[in-house]
């Protein structure tokens, strides 16, 4: 779910970034330059952080016509990692992500709207735990340019907040833990 959101963020940021023509990008997961992280309140006293280690995605954008941009991301929900094996096992269970039944989460953008210089709202359909809901990712363009290996890259960050019960995740964690914030950091390689 985080990965999908991240891909959407990258797309929206790129749209307002600085390219003069339409371009297709692949999210750089091989070089470990893309992350789908999350945080959720732990009992209202602190934050629990985690990440999804296996995801893939692509985006296309045209700075001259951001509304035509698209983003698509697929995330392996079993790749969740909170740095605690027993907790990760519980998150993968039917109490939360139910990975045996819903092994992937996806994000498909439906619209991109510029919100200012270098920022955009990326709206799309997030499918998580077998439930599809619209989400909006607040995206920010970080930068773009040539890399040392002859390629061209663009980077973005984004955030969105999800209500767990919207995705049929109903395990009672207390009132301080009803939402999860997705924190996306994406770098794409122009194809």
From Swiss-Prot:
Cited NCBIfam families: PRK03757.1
- Spell out the protein name for this chain: UPF0312 protein Pmen_0419
The entry sums up its family as follows: Belongs to the UPF0312 family. Type 1 subfamily.
Cysteine pairs bridged by disulfides in the record: none
* InterPro entries per the UniProt record, alphabetical: Lipid/polyisoprenoid-bd_YceI (IPR007372), TTHA0802/YceI-like_sf (IPR036761), UPF0312/YceI (IPR023480)
What are the top taxonomic ranks of the organism?
Bacteria, Pseudomonadati, Pseudomonadota, Gammaproteobacteria, Pseudomonadales
* Residues spanning the signal sequence: 1-22
Subcellular location, in the record's words? Periplasm
Question: Where would one find coiled-coil regions in this protein?
Answer: none
Main location, first listed in the record? periplasm
GO CC terms: periplasmic space
Which one Pfam family would you cite for this protein?
Answer: YceI
Keywords of the record, alphabetical order, are:
Periplasm, Signal
């Amino acid at each position: 779910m985080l990965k999908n959101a991240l891909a959407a963020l990258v797309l929206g940021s790129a749209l307002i970034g600085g390219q003069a023509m339409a371009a297709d990008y692949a999210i750089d997961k091989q070089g470990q330059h893309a992350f789908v992280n999350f945080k959720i309140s732990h009992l209202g006293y602190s934050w629990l952080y985690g990440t999804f280690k296996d995801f893939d995605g692509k985006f296309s954008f045209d700075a001259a016509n951001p509304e035509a941009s698209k983003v698509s991301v697929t995330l392996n929900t079993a790749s969740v990692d909170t740095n605690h094996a027993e907790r990760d096992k519980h998150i993968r269970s039917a109490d939360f992500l139910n990975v045996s039944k819903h092994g992937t989460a996806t994000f498909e953008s439906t619209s991109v709207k510029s919100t200012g210089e270098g920022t955009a709202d990326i709206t799309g359909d997030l499918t998580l735990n077998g439930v599809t809901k619209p989400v909006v990712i607040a995206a920010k363009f970080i930068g773009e340019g040539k890399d040392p290996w002859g390629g061209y890259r663009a980077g973005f960050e984004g955030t969105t907040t999800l209500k767990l019960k919207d995705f049929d995740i109903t395990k009672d964690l207390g009132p301080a833990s009803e939402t999860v914030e997705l924190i996306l950091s994406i770098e794409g390689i122009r194809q």
